[in-house]
Amino acid sequence: GVQTCALPILYQRSPVLALERQGALWAVRSSAGAVLAEQVVIASNAYTEGEWTNLRRHFFPGYYYQVASASLHGAAAERILPHGQGSWDTRTVLSSIRRDAQGRLLLGSLGNGANKPAWFLRQWADRIQSHYFPDLGQVNWEYSWTGCIAFTPDHLMRLFEPAEGLLAVTGYNGRGVTTGTVVGKAFADYLLSGERATLPLPFSDMKPVPAARLRSCAYEMGFSLYHAGQCLRVVL
């Protein structure tokens, strides 16, 4: 016999403008067209945007920046995470350490790097690098970028089922790579079986986070003060 399967189609650069019930289906509309579906999963987490959903009210945004060096060579560079591991320390405001396929050293931490001058990021990166990898000597930092994190007051993610056939998740609190993989499989199992026992957590009520903007500002201020202390060698 011949087996066929429907291959998924991935649409890019087509932000959702509206999500509405249309009979037994959901209509997901963008500026370029619409898709009808029996089931919809909103999995955009901190990058959820638009007036078509109030999901943004259920977390407060934070940020994480990374700084990348030029490609590093030599014995000192080869001793840094030689098996391609990622690493994090346990400081009050953590630092992440990894290397990419081009041999760059990537350092990261909590905070909005887009709001900080380049000299500040370089000084911070120099401080972390010289502590952990002093044998490297002076490093040239070439790139920096910032991503967004969805925080919740209790540091736990939220699973929602606002309506039949509609699921949402948010609030990974910076642990989206591993946790999101688990939730993705659990959502798939739940949509196929309808069994809530397949979910890692029960569904949460749709309760907005109070004072979300104030929380975001307070977190960012704390991160920035800590990084300033690192640059001034008050803390490490």
Question: Language-model features: where?
Answer:
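Short, conserved active-site loop motifs that form the nucleotide-linked donor/cofactor pocket
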Residues: 8-9, 166
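Short, small-residue-biased leader/transition segments that mark boundaries at the very start
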Residues: 1-7
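A conserved short coil-to-beta-strand element within the FAD-binding core of flavoproteins
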Residues: 9-26
